């Protein structure tokens, strides 16, 4: 008799994706973050569902409903902080996952990579809209500033902003639609993630060496299921430590003040995971230029396969490219720090230099370095 997991139409799909999946025997812990992102998404959907049961998307009651969740709902504060800090864990895993893809040349799987970039943009949009929902000062002003960027688009800009707002300012209509979008997008993300996985399983996983591992595959279960569970335990431990010891560490104190359109906070800034892009936006004095640079900072990922000039796929045996990669990581950390600083000397010039360096490394230095490495190896 054939095993049910190999014959049942539904079980067969699960089996081919998570049990009998042939996996390279040498993939490292950097390959754990895909499964961690799946766990983060499930956690966010579940905690978000319970929050939505008690939240009201009306400007007069939104802030109070969040306070009610924290004070009166059984373990509401745990659910709320799991959701807020779960988003931070989500982005930590996302950045590492993308970084791994860049380092080991995983972007050569074009379909998987392009769906991944779409996923990144969708998750960023979802997180931004979620940040608006508690209707604190930073929620309101963050929404106002970021949606206002659309007005930089020539000719249709102003109409576009008012269309997004549903009025002449960020108000009840904006909050209601942001709540609706914030609720539906995670399910779209789940669907996209399934497509992402589908494309990945067409080609099989990459591995640290960047060369074909067809002759050296092992089943996903039990080897990588155990490995993924260990990674998940570490992530959950980190998340619970954050939630139970310092839940407001990554938040903004201004968001504990109800939204007031008549009072602008001294420093408007988004959540920490958007600060690198925010720093690039602010480093250009021109509004349209800043918006284009902001978009380019993420969309540049789509160009990665075209910018790959090395004869080797992975950076494992390319020390010059490795140095550049870690300079890029340091540059992104610098941009994240700058994004949270006030717009004054010396932060302005540091931000501008870091922004130039970001694009310079990706568009110029990495391709040239790869060509030099090819020549050194006489390829």
From Swiss-Prot:
It comes from the Eukaryota. The chain crosses the membrane at residues 33-53, 77-98, 113-133, 178-198, 226-246, 288-308, 320-340, 347-367. Its cofactor is heme b. The keyword tRNA-binding does not apply. Keywords: Electron transport, Heme, Iron, Membrane, Metal-binding, Mitochondrion, Mitochondrion inner membrane, Respiratory chain, Transmembrane, Transmembrane helix, Transport, Ubiquinone. Heme b b566 binds at residues 97, 196. InterPro entries: Cyt_b/b6_C (IPR005798), Cyt_b/b6_C_sf (IPR036150), Cyt_b/b6_N (IPR005797), Cytb/b6-like_sf (IPR027387), Cytochrome_b (IPR030689), Cytochrome_b_C_euk/bac (IPR048260), Cytochrome_b_N_euk/bac (IPR048259), Di-haem_cyt_TM (IPR016174). GO terms for biological process: mitochondrial electron transport, ubiquinol to cytochrome c. It is a multi-pass membrane protein. GO terms for cellular component: mitochondrial inner membrane; respiratory chain complex III. The cytochrome bc1 complex contains 11 subunits: 3 respiratory subunits (MT-CYB, CYC1 and UQCRFS1), 2 core proteins (UQCRC1 and UQCRC2) and 6 low-molecular weight proteins (UQCRH/QCR6, UQCRB/QCR7, UQCRQ/QCR8, UQCR10/QCR9, UQCR11/QCR10 and a cleavage product of UQCRFS1). This cytochrome bc1 complex then forms a dimer. Heme b b562 binds at residues 83, 182. Heme 1 (or BL or b562) is low-potential and absorbs at about 562 nm, and heme 2 (or BH or b566) is high-potential and absorbs at about 566 nm. It comes from Phacochoerus aethiopicus. Binds 2 heme b groups non-covalently. This is Cytochrome b. Coiled coil: none annotated. Belongs to the cytochrome b family. The keyword Signal does not apply. One of its GO terms (molecular function) is metal ion binding. It holds the Pfam family Cytochrome_B. A ubiquinone binds at residue 201. It is found in: Mitochondrion inner membrane. Component of the ubiquinol-cytochrome c reductase complex (complex III or cytochrome b-c1 complex) that is part of the mitochondrial respiratory chain. The b-c1 complex mediates electron transfer from ubiquinol to cytochrome c. Contributes to the generation of a proton gradient across the mitochondrial membrane that is then used for ATP synthesis. Its main location: mitochondrion.
